[in-house]
């Protein structure tokens, strides 16, 4: 099987650059899989789990919080607003972040601050759901 070159980049670092069989991406219009030879496309991402597939099995999973995905003839590049390997996430720490975000929503003094806090809370809950 022809491999797909894949790069996952966050503002902090390059998380992965590898040749893989497939990448399942949480697109804003729905999840989609990318293989070598995929038609070129550019789309936005929603918060969710990005899975790298090798040998028919999910080899690595990352939580991505928004961003862009670009498929070209050379491969797939994901520029994520935030990305972290699911294997590195700690449940109790995440639960505390959710609790803090809930307090931020409750304490917000104006609509703009509340909306930002609610977006953060929703993303953290999405991440918690991805962890199971």
Per-segment meaning from a language model:
Residues 1-3:
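Short, charged, intrinsically disordered terminal tails
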Residues 84-132:
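Acidic/glycine-rich phosphate/pyrophosphate-binding loops and surrounding catalytic core
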Residues 5-100:
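Compact, glycine-rich, soluble single-domain proteins
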